[in-house]
Swiss-Prot record:
Regions that span the bilayer: 17-40, 78-103, 120-145, 174-199, 218-242, 269-294
Assembly mode: Homotetramer. Adopts an asymmetrical dimer of dimers functional form. Interacts with MICU1 (when methylated); leading to decrease the calcium sensitivity of MICU1.
Sequence ranges on the Mitochondrial matrix membrane side: 41-77, 146-173, 243-268
Repeat (Solcar) residue spans along the chain: 11-106, 114-203, 212-297
Protein name: Dicarboxylate carrier UCP2
Function: Antiporter that exports dicarboxylate intermediates of the Krebs cycle in exchange for phosphate plus a proton across the inner membrane of mitochondria, a process driven by mitochondrial motive force with an overall impact on glycolysis, glutaminolysis and glutathione-dependent redox balance. Continuous export of oxaloacetate and related four-carbon dicarboxylates from mitochondrial matrix into the cytosol negatively regulates the oxidation of acetyl-CoA substrates via the Krebs cycle lowering the ATP/ADP ratio and reactive oxygen species (ROS) production.
Region described as Important for interaction with long-chain fatty acids: spans on this chain: 16-63, 278-285
Signal peptide bounds: none
Domain notes: The GDP-binding domain is located within the hydrophilic cavity, with GDP phosphates likely forming salt bridges with the charged residues, Lys-141 and Arg-185. The long-chain fatty acid-binding domain consists of an hydrophobic groove between peripheral transmembrane helices 1 and 6 near the matrix side.
Organism of origin: Sus scrofa (Pig)
Superkingdom field: Eukaryota
GO MF, one annotated term: proton transmembrane transporter activity
Length: 309
């Protein structure tokens, strides 16, 4: 057995909720530069973007984007929006991942044998619910990642200033900008990510190919990351473009997608695919492995506290 041993008592809903948020924050800390590179690549080619310095930069590939940002804006630019990103994960991942098992059991009426339909429904539900809770943090994160530090093109001085400025200039609706594509994206992402992880892990365990420990969690998470990136990239690009757009640039998420298709062609929907996969693949591995271990560690700590002397 590699890592913490599974406890006899299954993790509580609270343990899953806190464990998911904490694991997601750890994963974000490690993979955030890849996410920032993905955002810069996704908005590239958007000629009328609000941050011209960022939008007009010529980024080529993951490494090229990271090197260009470090050269022009300094290493700290790779972590633009990190505070909002961590705020997002604590509210977002806690709901979409931490509540997944509980919602799945609700749809299966407590049965241990969950079908693909119940898993998909649970993933869609928690993914959409998480967006409703965490959308403002996602908007601020994307705005920070998109803005360039060089050339005086910064839109916001701090995370708090970003929330205040968006609310003042665009109204409260501005903080929930892009909710529709984000709900669609996260329903898709959650289904692809959690359901694929669930299915791969169950298959490996039932076929006795692996035991329920770190190698199994690593393999399941990596496979889930690839499947999720392929499925979710188009709606992810639209979400990023729309949330970063100036007021009036696009009338809706659908208009944003149509404009991309007309001006840049179908390939635009897979801009930033490589950093998306590198980020999501590595993020999934770190998050799921950490999450599984945190659940076991927290339950072991709880058991030791409750054990009689």
């Amino acid at each position: 057995m590699v890592g913490f041993k599974a406890t006899e008592v299954p993790p509580t809903a609270t343990v899953k909720f806190l464990g998911a948020g904490t694991a997601a924050c750890i994963a974000d800390l490690i993979t955030f530069p890849l996410d920032t590179a993905k955002v810069r690549l996704q908005i590239q080619g958007e000629r009328r973007g609000p941050v011209q310095a960022a939008a007009s930069a010529q980024y080529r590939g993951v490494l090229g984007t990271i090197l260009t940002m470090v050269r022009n804006e300094g290493p700290r630019s790779l972590y633009n929006g990190l505070v909002a990103g961590l705020q997002r994960q604590m509210s977002f991942a806690s709901v979409r991942i931490g509540l997944y098992d509980s919602v799945k059991h609700f749809y299966t009426k407590g049965s241990e044998h969950a079908g693909i339909g119940s898993r998909l429904l649970a993933g869609s539900t928690t993914g959409a619910l998480a967006v409703a809770v965490a959308q403002p943090t996602d908007v601020v994160k994307v705005r920070f990642q998109a803005q360039a530090r060089a050339g005086g093109g910064r839109r916001y001085r701090s995370t708090v200033d970003a929330y205040k400025t968006i609310a003042r200039e665009e109204g409260l609706r501005g903080l929930w900008k892009g909710t529709s594509p984000n709900v669609a994206r996260n329903a898709i992402v959650n289904c692809a990510e959690l359901v694929t992880y669930d299915l791969i892990k169950d298959t490996l365990l039932k076929a006795d190919l692996m035991t329920d420990d770190l190698p199994c969690h690593f393999t399941s998470a990596f496979g889930a990351g690839f499947c999720t990136t392929v499925i979710a990239s188009p709606v992810d690009v639209v979400k990023t473009r729309y949330m970063n757009s100036a007021p009036g640039q696009y009338s809706s998420a659908g208009h944003c997608a149509l404009t991309m298709l007309q001006k840049e062609g179908p390939r635009a929907f897979y801009k930033g695919f490589t950093p998306s996969f590198l980020r999501l693949g590595s993020w999934n591995v770190v998050m799921f492995v950490t999450y599984e271990q945190l659940k076991r560690a927290l339950m072991a700590a709880r058991a030791s506290r409750e054990a009689p002397f």
